[in-house]
Amino acid sequence: MGKKKVVYIFALVLVFLTFAWCAFRRCSTNEHYLSVLPSDVIALSRIHVDELVKAKENSPSLFTTFFLQRFSNKSGIKFSSPLYAFMDAERRLGVVGAVSNASTLKSFLTKNHFKIERNNDFNMATWNYLHLVFDDEKFFAIFKLSSSDTGIEDYMVKSMMQSEQASCALQSAIDTLDGQFTLVAHANALPQSMTDLMEVILPKDTHPKDITITSSLSLHEKDFRLEGKISSDKTEINKLLDRIDNTFRPVEKYVSFDAINPSIASIIHLNVEGKEFLQFARSIPDVRLALLALNMCIDADMMISSVNGPVSIYNAKESSGTGNMILSASLENTDFLRNIDDWDDNMTSGTIGYEKLSDKEFRIEAFEKNFWFSIQNQSLHLASPNCINTLAGLAVSAQNSNGKETQNIMVMQVKWDAVKEMLIPPLQDYLKQDKTILLQFSDSRHFNIQMQ
């Protein structure tokens, strides 16, 4: 055998042994607690605590400030192994991780007012709605939805005893992602308001659970950036995503919060050609029916077809605390106003109709809701009743702004104050209140979220 062949064979054997050792290390360090993950998980995130701390050891981050101050190395939790946070099918939130010292963990929980009992071969700790079960190797924590959420202890013990084959199906997907903080979720893990909207838009016989979202997040000092991807095994959903790409054009420029009314809590920026968007809207059965109803009173099809250019959807938070919508769209023409005298002016409660307030200002009643719309400077503005004062100066502010350049098909800005109530109190107070969350879609399948 030649010397070269011996070298090649030796190299192949070395590579094989390296992969085998890595696989052995992965299994030996992880399988003893990953098997605890419930089989009905709809969202799963992996958190490399040690990497997050190393990355920010010279400056405090959201994670190190909130998490490590509460759970130091005296907790008995093994932070050199990743933590896995999840949402199950009942929308309960939980965490799974490795235990470095069960006695230390038990002492830590006792000092923090947890009630600890034995359940089978495990320690069961409870405090209000938080339940935590652990042994010498692993722990499993979960938040009860309410006091009526019964059977939680049996559910947790069953998960602690299950085999790896019965555990979370999303685990293999998250293993393909790199990052300090990674996430895999089915779209039915999103808030109810979003899944309800998706049910309307998605093709027949498809559901939010048929969409998978994967993302990786990196934390920086007082902010973060998340890169994400949307995918589906359903052919009809992929066709819908392709139609979205063909319908929505790059935004090019968008107005920042600095240039508009301070009562605005969030903005969605789009760029559409009205005729193409109308065809897309008609492909959605519920939207098509709504358009048919509107067209019995006003020329909704012609109004939509007249749009060409930037479209912005504003959510204004009034002093009363209620949220209200404003839509502003650039018009190619105002031809739909030619037939204004033919629009039905019968405003009987519960019907669809309109009231002419001036030559270019109107009130529409549709689906038991009132809206005002006006034409200003070749733009269409549609607003809910409480937003009239906000709408008055909005168009001028938008036109006076140079805008920020982008090539994304959708840009959404959200003020931190508008979402911080969704988080637990320690995180609410940590980040500065003048922050803005920016969500951008480069196409229908790729997005990023960052804090500015």
Residues covered by each model-derived region:
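Membrane-interface motif at the C-terminal end of an N-terminal transmembrane signal
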Residues: 16-35
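Membrane-proximal juxtamembrane linkers immediately C-terminal to transmembrane helices
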Residues: 33-43
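Positively charged n-region of N-terminal signal peptides that target proteins for export
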Residues: 1-5, 9
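Short extracytoplasmic
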Residues: 42-66
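Leucine-rich, highly hydrophobic segment in Treponema pallidum outer-membrane-associated proteins
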Residues: 8-20, 159-279, 407-452
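Interface amphipathic segments
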Residues: 32-33, 235-259, 371-374, 382-400
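Extended non-catalytic domains of envelope/secretory-pathway proteins
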Residues: 252-310, 317-321, 332-337
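Single conserved position on a long alpha-helix in the C-terminal lobe of the eukaryotic protein kinase
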Residues: 45, 75-177, 305-410
